């Protein structure tokens, strides 16, 4: 574990070097609570997670809680209580279930102090053409609060239906989570440059963010971790490395890290939209492409704790030995992967459940950092 901690600290330093001096960090997507999938984010853990990188504020909402029925009421109350106990760090959102009085629960939560709405069509099993969404968007427009909606895996195309809602309720600000990867090309066609629509950076693959920067105005992008699923320093490192490769200016990086989200929270007019800065193509050696491929294969195996994870990591590590230049980068990636392998091999022998969880999380962090380096090391 000590080797892993020291390696992670190196990338904390890299994040600090990439971050513009005195730039505010506002995390646009964190959770507090307990998910039915077993992930937990206590208030103390969340505040410590935010404090480690000097995050000033965060949009916070509950997970898919075991007691989510009826209407996420108890979970929303806990989110509000957490926000009150956070000394202004957490900006609370109310999570809704369209099957259980969504407008009534949103109204109740907003009256009690919520400052936004969270919708998760995959977890709550609804489509974006559901007629029950219209009154939710109407309420958000009337109350001048943002809606953050899941835009990641597990969804059919969503752009057309979201466009209708945004056109009907233009005063409702929309944040599409996970860079809108469920339908990114069409979402960008509909919303690139739109003053009331934003996309957050909470994804695993740097390729998703590079594609987003190619399609979306930089002023529409909000840094987000998706804690407890997203961890540091990978969450900030992926946002900053891809922004650098896409060619964002220092001022645009400041918008991404915090200024744009703070503007949403404080009710300020959005920044003037500028054209996308990203590139259509990236130059990458075959070696780094192969490393990325194997690490992408390993990621779901890590999540589900499959035995063959060690073998797939071995493929990535062996590829680092190819001699086609970029010696320093290959050595850095190899060190991360070797440390991840070492930790993964130790897991069965760790008896304490909490220690085993920490080691598992560090393994994922190391693999994520290695993949970010593999994708964002340009061969140009």
Can you say where each PLM-predicted feature lies in the sequence?
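Mid-to-C-terminal alpha-helical segments outside catalytic/metal-binding sites
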Residues: 1-24, 28, 47-48, 56-57, ...
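Acidic-and-aromatic substrate-binding clefts and catalytic sites of carbohydrate-active enzymes
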Residues: 34-41, 66-72, 96-103, 124-129, ...
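Ligand-binding grooves and catalytic loops that recognize ribose/phosphate and carbohydrate rings
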Residues: 130-136, 155, 194, 211-264
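Histidine-centered catalytic micro-motifs
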Residues: 25-35, 148-152, 179
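Divalent metal-dependent hydrolysis catalytic cores, especially in the metallo-beta-lactamase
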Residues: 28-31, 37-39, 44-68, 89-97, ...
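Active-site gating/metal-coordination segments in enzymes
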Residues: 57, 70-146, 212, 353, ...
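Catalytic pocket-lining loop regions of alpha/beta-barrel enzymes
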Residues: 3-4, 8, 116, 130-222, ...
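Conserved, mostly hydrophobic/aromatic
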Residues: 29, 50, 79, 83, ...
């Amino acid at each position: 574990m000590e080797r892993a901690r020291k390696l992670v600290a190196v990338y904390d330093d890299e994040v600090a070097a990439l971050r513009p001096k005195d730039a505010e960090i506002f995390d646009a997507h964190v959770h507090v609570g307990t998910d039915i999938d077993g992930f937990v984010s206590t208030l103390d853990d969340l505040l410590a997670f935010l404090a480690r990188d000097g995050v000033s504020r965060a949009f916070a909402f509950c997970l898919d809680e075991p007691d989510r029925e009826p209407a996420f009421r108890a979970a929303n109350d806990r989110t509000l209580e957490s926000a009150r106990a956070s000394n202004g760090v957490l900006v609370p959102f109310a999570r809704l279930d369209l099957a259980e009085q969504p407008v009534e629960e949103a109204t109740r939560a907003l009256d009690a102090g919520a400052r936004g709405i969270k919708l998760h069509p995959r977890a709550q099993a609804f489509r974006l053409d559901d007629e029950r969404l219209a009154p939710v968007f109407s309420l958000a427009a009337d109350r001048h609060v943002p809606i953050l909606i899941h835009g990641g895996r597990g969804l059919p195309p969503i752009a057309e239906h979201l466009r209708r809602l945004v056109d009907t309720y233009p005063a409702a600000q929309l944040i599409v989570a996970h860079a809108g990867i469920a339908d990114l090309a069409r979402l960008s066609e509909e919303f690139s440059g739109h003053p009331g629509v934003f996309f957050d950076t909470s994804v695993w693959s740097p390729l998703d963010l590079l594609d987003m920067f190619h399609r979306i105005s930089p002023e529409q992008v909000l840094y987000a971790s998706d804690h407890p699923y997203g961890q540091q320093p990978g969450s900030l490192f992926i946002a900053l490395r891809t922004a650098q490769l896409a060619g964002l200016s220092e001022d645009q990086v400041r918008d991404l890290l915090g200024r744009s989200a703070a503007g949403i929270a404080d009710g300020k007019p959005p920044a003037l939209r500028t054209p996308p800065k990203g590139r259509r193509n990236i130059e990458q050696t075959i070696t780094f492409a192969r490393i990325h491929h194997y690490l992408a294969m390993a990621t779901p195996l890590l999540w589900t704790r499959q035995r063959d994870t060690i073998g797939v990591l071995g493929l990535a590590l062996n590829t680092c030995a190819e001699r086609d230049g970029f010696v320093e980068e290959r050595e850095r990636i190899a060190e991360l992967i070797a440390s991840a392998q070492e930790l993964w091999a130790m897991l069965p022998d760790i008896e304490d459940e909490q220690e085993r969880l920490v080691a598992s999380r560090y393994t994922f962090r190391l693999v994520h950092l290695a993949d970010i380096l593999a994708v964002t090391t340009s061969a140009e």
